[in-house]
């Protein structure tokens, strides 16, 4: 109707490439019924609790250790694997936000956490390399999130909320978040709108976000149910979004 052509073959090829990437990612994280991995050997009764909303270190007990091939009782220097503890300050990759990095220390060794992932059954996996000594199941461990990594990730996470508010102010209340990605170096924010933004609109949004950043508004953490969150005036939730009870 408007002399627009669609490269259907190219679209289908790109879609299939993305499907392959998604399947491979699920295999790495054992997410949503992925292929069997070493994590399937773990006792399903074992769980992890995240306690890192207001601190970056904690003491915990090591409940599971794995190499890349099997569940083990100990890791030695040079081993690559996963550490699971009962309580952790490490945030796992989810909701478009990359998981924390840092170190796990025991009296006998040190493990460098290269990424943190969410596993089936409420487990949080700290994936990385044993860089010094050894550690065993049952050891008391000191969990230490990288302060710089967490701080930069938090800044970009907060920026997505500032950006959403600025977009709704400039473009209208029809704007809804459709996805996002956050890590220490960048953010991506997907949203609904009827057309491409003009240079003037982009400049207005940028000015609003920068003004709010300059105000240094205090950031607080509240843990609440979805129903409670829907009653808070500053919260804009997507009507179609599926979330847990907390």
Model-derived regions: residue spans:
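A glycine- and charged-residue-rich anion-binding loop/surface
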Residues: 1-238
């Amino acid at each position: 109707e408007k002399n627009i052509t669609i490269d259907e073959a190219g679209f289908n090829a790109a879609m299939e490439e993305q499907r392959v990437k998604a399947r491979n990612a699920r295999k790495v994280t054992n997410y949503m019924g992925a292929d069997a991995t070493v994590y399937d050997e773990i006792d399903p009764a074992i769980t992890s609790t995240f306690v890192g909303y207001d601190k970056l270190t904690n003491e915990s007990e090591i409940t599971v250790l794995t190499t890349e091939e099997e569940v083990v009782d100990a890791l030695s220097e040079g081993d690559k694997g996963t550490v699971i503890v009962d309580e952790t300050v490490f945030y796992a990759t989810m909701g478009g936000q990359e998981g924390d990095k840092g170190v796990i220390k025991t009296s006998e060794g040190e493990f460098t956490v290269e990424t943190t992932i969410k596993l089936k059954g409420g487990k949080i996996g700290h994936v990385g390399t044993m860089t010094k000594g050894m550690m065993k199941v049952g050891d008391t461990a000191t969990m230490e999130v990288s302060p710089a990594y967490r701080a930069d990730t938090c800044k970009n996470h907060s920026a997505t909320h500032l950006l959403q508010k600025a977009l709704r102010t400039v473009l209208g209340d029809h704007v809804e978040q459709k996805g996002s990605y956050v890590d220490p170096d960048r953010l991506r924010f997907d949203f609904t709108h009827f057309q491409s933004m003009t240079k003037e609109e982009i400049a207005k949004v940028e000015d609003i976000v920068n003004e709010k950043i300059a105000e240094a508004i205090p950031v607080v953490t509240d843990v609440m149910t979805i129903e409670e969150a829907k009653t808070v005036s500053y919260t804009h939730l997507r009507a179609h979004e599926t979330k847990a009870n907390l």
